[in-house]
Amino acid sequence: MGLQETIGIEIVSVEKGKAVVQLEVTEKVHQPFGYLHGGVSVVLAEHAASIGAAKSIEPDEIVFGLEINANHLASKQAGLVTATAEAIHIGKSTQVWEIKITDETEKLLCISRCTIAVKKKRK
């Protein structure tokens, strides 16, 4: 079982240049004060960027997160959050994605930028 299954990330849609994932905010993803853990938001953002990036590579390639940053703008104690990742740059060896995490009312909770490395699969 991967991290996405452990915390409950669900894929909504994936297409070249865009990916959308969701997560139900429950106690298992809270920080000590009862709010969505910032690290979980970063995991959600990188997961969305990674699955989106995977749609733009060749069958003999694989993607890895190279760098990520996140600005946490608002908190959330319960409910559904949605991460929408959109490609800013799709190159041969790197991709750059912007990810916005919103709640059910479209309130922006977190904005993130993720750089993805594209590598050849090892044989």
From Swiss-Prot:
- Pfam families found in the cross-reference section: 4HBT
Q: Which PANTHER family match?
A: 1,4-DIHYDROXY-2-NAPHTHOYL-COA THIOESTERASE 1
The annotated pathway is: Quinol/quinone metabolism; menaquinone biosynthesis
Entry EC no(s): 3.1.2.28
**Organism listed in the record:** Listeria monocytogenes serotype 1/2a (strain 10403S)
**What's the protein here called?**
1,4-dihydroxy-2-naphthoyl-CoA hydrolase
SUPFAM superfamilies the record matches: Thioesterase/thiol ester dehydrase-isomerase (SSF54637)
Keyword terms, alphabetized: Hydrolase, Menaquinone biosynthesis, Virulence
The residues annotated as the active site are E46 (nucleophile or proton acceptor)
What Gene Ontology terms for biological process does this UniProt record contain?
menaquinone biosynthetic process
**Looking at the record's lineage, which domain of life comes first?**
Bacteria
Gene from which the chain derives? menI
Q: Which reaction does it catalyse?
A: 1,4-dihydroxy-2-naphthoyl-CoA + H2O = 1,4-dihydroxy-2-naphthoate + CoA + H(+)
For the keyword Amino-acid biosynthesis, the answer is: no
What's the top EC group for this one?
Answer: hydrolase
Which family is annotated?
Belongs to the thioesterase PaaI family.
What phenotype has been reported when the gene encoding this protein is knocked out?
Answer: Deletion of the gene results in an ablated membrane potential, indicative of a non-functional electron transport chain (ETC) and an inability to aerobically respire. Mutants fail to replicate in minimal defined medium and are killed in the cytosol approximately 4- to 6-fold more frequently than the wild-type strain.
This molecule's function is given as: Catalyzes the hydrolysis of 1,4-dihydroxy-2-naphthoyl-CoA (DHNA-CoA) to 1,4-dihydroxy-2-naphthoate (DHNA) and free coenzyme A. Production of DHNA is required for protection against bacteriolysis in the cytosol of macrophages and tissue-specific virulence in vivo, suggesting that MenI is required to protect the bacteria from killing in the macrophage cytosol.
Identify one Gene Ontology CC term for this UniProt entry: cytosol
> Top-down, what is the taxonomic lineage of the species of origin?
Bacteria, Bacillati, Bacillota, Bacilli, Bacillales
The record's listing under CDD domains reads:
PaaI_thioesterase (cd03443)
Give the molecular function GO annotations.
1,4-dihydroxy-2-naphthoyl-CoA thioesterase activity
Q: What Gene3D superfamilies does the record point to?
A: Hotdog Thioesterase
